[in-house]
């Protein structure tokens, strides 16, 4: 089995003016595709090539391969981006259980956003920022490069089931925002798919 590029559930310009069409197209068809190509190449003729990406990521610490670090980066890139595309949608509203849980953990929605933005802005270099469910407690964490919380603490230095995630690699925003990372981070709130996030809270 080879991993394939998932189709986006919207057009490349659907998130304008916050996430621009050119960035979305390059991000999806070039960067994400490259992670998939590399993952398939690394796993070719191994017993791991038939595993769903979620299972592969969850046992990464147990895998013995010469190119394990490259697998970590590229398989992580695949699962992170697959999650990211589903996490974006214009016009959704934060309501119900997720809103209650965020307020319980962080005080207010504005305080939650401020903390998320601070973690994203102060993360050095490339990586991701996540809202995760850690055994029933919502936490904001960051991971380096293409690490995922699903890889577990031994690899990603954190853990939890992702509820929302933001790509803070420069390729995710530089065409539109250049070095204005905070503007990109703040624009994210306009395209968070809160419906998907609420569904993830229930898992």
From Swiss-Prot:
Lineage of the organism: Bacteria, Pseudomonadati, Pseudomonadota, Gammaproteobacteria, Enterobacterales
Description of how the protein assembles with itself and partners: Homodimer.
The protein's required cofactors: Mn(2+)
SUPFAM superfamilies documented for this protein: Fe,Mn superoxide dismutase (SOD), C-terminal domain, Fe,Mn superoxide dismutase (SOD), N-terminal domain
Annotated source species: Buchnera aphidicola subsp. Acyrthosiphon pisum (strain APS) (Acyrthosiphon pisum symbiotic bacterium)
Function per UniProt: Destroys superoxide anion radicals which are normally produced within the cells and which are toxic to biological systems.
GO molecular-function terms, A-Z: metal ion binding; superoxide dismutase activity
The protein's Enzyme Commission number: 1.15.1.1
Entries under PROSITE patterns matching the protein: SOD_MN
InterPro entries for this protein: Mn/Fe_SOD, Mn/Fe_SOD_BS, Mn/Fe_SOD_C, Mn/Fe_SOD_N, Mn/Fe_SOD_N_sf, SOD_C_sf
Residues that, per the record, bind Mn(2+): 27, 81, 167, 171
Protein name as catalogued: Superoxide dismutase [Mn]
Ranges in a coiled coil: none
PANTHER family xref list: 37S RIBOSOMAL PROTEIN S26, MITOCHONDRIAL, SMALL RIBOSOMAL SUBUNIT PROTEIN MS42
Family: Belongs to the iron/manganese superoxide dismutase family.
Keyword Metal-binding found: yes
